[in-house]
């Protein structure tokens, strides 16, 4: 049965301001509910070093999928001096294109000022005057809400010159993307923002030293930045106490796919996937059986029913062979062909490859071709062997960025748990070697 907890500022720092209809919280209501108090506290009573230290103590990790410590990332920015210059940038990664993921859109459309306040506090910590929100181009309504919120924040004196009576200047700009998944990678995002082709960059140099227009740059996710204000309002001890695991705070989590009540909820780290699946999402719809689930987007490995009791956090999901990712899970019922499902996923990643490196550019289309052959049940035994070889050749360290390694995770896990389904797609009467597959690479 679907049963939701009541939201309070002590238990749900990201969503407690929402009413029952989940209307957008504009600045008057946001300020009435302690909005911008954290930013005022930071500007009037803290130094940038104090802010970074507090975020380090909080244990806040990036919510974009990698789970890198936010305070550590901020501390990597070089000092203001003649060597590194006095101009630096903060970029908010709002290019949310992971299939099945909509947590950032939810936060931007429902509590936009929470994001703006998080950006302002972060900008203060990093000595940044200009910040950019790199927004997914298809999020037209989100863009409208953010633009209106920026106008409101400017009118209330939180953006512009002499913010909160200080000598500080803060500006926030919105840049809409052109619909490329690869822009979720921070250096590809930077290239796109500069007007270049959205290819990932070589590292080093890292963006913290050579980023946007060659200046020190920090890139943070929407949900990461939205967490920041509450930490300064309620303290580190409180923030750590929200979680049921070593990962601190709460996380926007959800379930989609073949569940009764697909949705998104703010929940503590460490809650089990089963509790989300059964208590919040209501279990499988139409009395169907769960076949597989992905814990955090299309680029995360498949897990099966026995893994539902795993705590939803970065460490424990990794222990069972997947990644927490965006923490918006997808449930798949037993009527779905695993070969067709993987083919669908790989087609997306093949299409979204930037084409910069050969393994990704040629390997992903090759995988799609093989899966289409298997889907038609005209494959040969060598097809499965080649898929396994491609999983190895497109793995970590073999490609320029993490796009291909992430893309093949669903395939690797599908071969692990459902190899028989792949084998049943092989034509048992075929004595022909896979000439079609071997020759197909010449097309790319």
Curated annotation (Swiss-Prot):
It is an enzyme of class 7 (translocase). Coiled coil: none annotated. Binds 1 [4Fe-4S] cluster. Keywords: 4Fe-4S, Flavoprotein, FMN, Iron, Iron-sulfur, Metal-binding, NAD, Quinone, Translocase. Disulfide bonds: none annotated. Its cofactor is [4Fe-4S] cluster; FMN. Its EC number is 7.1.1.-. [4Fe-4S] cluster binds at residues 354, 357, 360, 401. FMN binds at residues 177-224. It comes from the Bacteria. Transmembrane segments: none annotated. NAD(+) binds at residues 62-71. PROSITE patterns: COMPLEX1_51K_1, COMPLEX1_51K_2. The keyword Nuclease does not apply. One of its GO terms (molecular function) is quinone binding. It catalyses: a quinone + NADH + 5 H(+)(in) = a quinol + NAD(+) + 4 H(+)(out). Belongs to the complex I 51 kDa subunit family. NDH-1 shuttles electrons from NADH, via FMN and iron-sulfur (Fe-S) centers, to quinones in the respiratory chain. Couples the redox reaction to proton translocation (for every two electrons transferred, four hydrogen ions are translocated across the cytoplasmic membrane), and thus conserves the redox energy in a proton gradient. Composed of 13 different subunits. Subunits NuoCD, E, F, and G constitute the peripheral sector of the complex. This is NADH-quinone oxidoreductase subunit F. The gene is nuoF.
């Amino acid at each position: 049965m679907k049963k939701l907890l009541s939201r309070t500022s002590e238990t749900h720092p990201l969503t407690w301001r929402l009413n029952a209809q989940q209307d957008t919280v504009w600045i008057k209501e946001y300020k009435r509910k302690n909005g911008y108090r954290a930013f005022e506290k930071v500007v009037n009573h803290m130094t940038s070093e104090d802010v970074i230290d507090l975020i380090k103590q909080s244990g806040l990790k990036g919510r974009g999928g990698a789970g890198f410590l936010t305070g550590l990332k901020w501390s990597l920015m070089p000092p203001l001096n003649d060597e590194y210059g006095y101009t630096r940038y903060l970029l908010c990664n709002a290019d949310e294109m992971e299939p099945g993921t909509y947590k950032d859109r939810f936060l931007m459309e429902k509590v936009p000022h929470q994001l703006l306040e998080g950006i302002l506090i972060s900008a203060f910590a990093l000595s940044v005057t200009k910040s950019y929100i790199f927004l997914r181009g298809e999020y037209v309504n989100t863009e409208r809400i953010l633009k209106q919120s920026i106008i409101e924040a400017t009118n209330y004196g939180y953006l512009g010159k002499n913010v909160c009576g200080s000598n500080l200047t803060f500006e926030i700009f919105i840049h809409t993307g052109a619909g490329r998944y690869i822009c979720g990678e921070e250096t590809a995002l930077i290239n796109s923002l500069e007007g270049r082709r959205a290819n990932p960059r070589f590292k080093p140099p890292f963006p913290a030293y050579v980023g946007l227009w060659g200046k020190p740059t920090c890139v943070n996710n929407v949900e990461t930045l939205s967490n920041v204000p509450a930490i300064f309002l309620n303290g580190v001890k409180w923030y750590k106490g929200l979680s049921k695991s070593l990962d601190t705070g709460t996380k926007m989590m959800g379930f989609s796919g073949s569940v009764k009540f697909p949705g998104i909820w703010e929940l503590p780290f460490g809650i089990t996937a089963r509790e989300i699946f059964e208590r919040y999402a209501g279990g499988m719809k139409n009395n169907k059986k769960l076949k597989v689930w992905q814990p955090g987007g299309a680029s995360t490995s498949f897990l099966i029913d026995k893994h539902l009791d795993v705590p939803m956090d970065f460490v424990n999901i990794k222990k069972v062979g997947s990644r927490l990712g965006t923490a918006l899970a997808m449930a798949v019922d037993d009527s779905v062909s695993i070969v067709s499902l993987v083919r669908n996923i790989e087609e997306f990643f093949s299409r979204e490859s930037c084409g910069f490196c050969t393994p990704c550019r040629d390997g992903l289309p090759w995988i799609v071709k093989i899966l289409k052959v298997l889907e038609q049940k005209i494959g040969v035994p060598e097809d499965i062997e080649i898929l396994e070889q491609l999983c190895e050749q497109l793995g970590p360290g073999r490609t320029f960025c993490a796009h291909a390694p992430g893309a093949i995770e669903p395939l690797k896990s599908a071969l692990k748990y459902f190899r028989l389904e792949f084998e049943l797609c092989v034509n048992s009467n075929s004595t022909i070697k896979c000439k079609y597959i071997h020759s197909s690479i010449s097309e790319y």
